[in-house]
Amino acid sequence: MSFLERFRKKPEDEASRIARLAKTGRMADGRIIDAVSDHEGRISQVTYTYMLAGVLYESSQALSTSQQQRSNDYAPGKQIVIRYDPRRPANSIVV
């Protein structure tokens, strides 16, 4: 291990990132702009946008099983609530 590697922040795994944002992330409004359906017709992945401080962000997320059961809530054009990290606003999740 090099000297600099000791001080680098360890990458956060996806499950930890989602749990942290779900618990402590700030809320904002967003809009679904695209959705991908699975073989059963349930929406499994969404692309969404949200605006913070005049900056438009775009992101995508695979939906959880419970979110997939509410596919109608994630159709393109629907308004959604997202949670984001105020220190890194591009880091967000669909609630």
PLM features: residue spans?
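Oxidizing extracytosolic/periplasmic lumen-facing domains
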Residues: 1-95
